[in-house]
Amino acid sequence: NKEFGIKALEMMKNISAYLITDCFIMDPIKTAEILSSTDDFYYSPYIYGFSNYCRENYKENILTYGNVIDLSNKGPNGTHLGGTGIAISNKSHHKDLALEYSYWIAGADCQKSIFYKSGGQPGNSVAWDNQQINNECNNFFTNTRLTLNQAWIRPRHNGYMKFQDESGNIINEYLQSDISEDILIDKLKTMYAESFYE
């Protein structure tokens, strides 16, 4: 929806006026690193969730995550859920074993125990509801659960990650210039359509 896209860009532009210039070259991990390692900044309005930064002894400062701001009176929605997944190569000589492993590592028993204890960020909701895990990571999953539940899953087609990277660069340029929102939305729509042909 072009109208909502323009509103979102305008809102980002308004927020960006309050940012330090370093924000335009930092990725979400760098933001979490600065928040957890210095006392220079205390808040980031939107950031990817990294539960390790909420654990004791991971960094100097323990971060507290919360749900994203509700701008629509529909709850904390509009974020996207992504992350690193697991896949099985079609060239594998042990597909059955790989499939068995995939089910095991994604399963609740593994996710709430060895996966989490080894520094992984669980994607299984049973682990998200686990009180011990929440106690150990400053209630990361409890505090962000509404956002997680209302997020949309990042598209999985081959060209999407390239689109995400390139569109992020273009939006970043827009935030620091006088590019028209109307022109930018048209460009992003074209890029997204082209991402299906990668």
List each model region and its residues.
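Glycine-centered hinge/linker elements that transmit conformational signals in sensory
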Residues: N1-D27, V68
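Short beta-strand->loop
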Residues: N1-F4, Y46-I47, S89
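Glycine-rich, aromatic-lined ligand/substrate-binding cores of catalytic
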Residues: K13-A17, I34-Y46, A87
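Extracytoplasmic/periplasmic substrate-recognition and gating elements
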Residues: A17, R55-Q121
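Beta->alpha turn/N-cap motifs
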Residues: P28, S44-N52, T84
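Short helices/loops that flank or line small-molecule/ion binding pockets
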Residues: P28-S44, N169, E173-S177
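Long, aromatic- and glycine/proline-rich binding clefts that accommodate carbohydrate-like moieties
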Residues: Y116-N169, E173
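Short, charged, surface-exposed loops that flank catalytic or proteolytic processing sites
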Residues: E173-L188
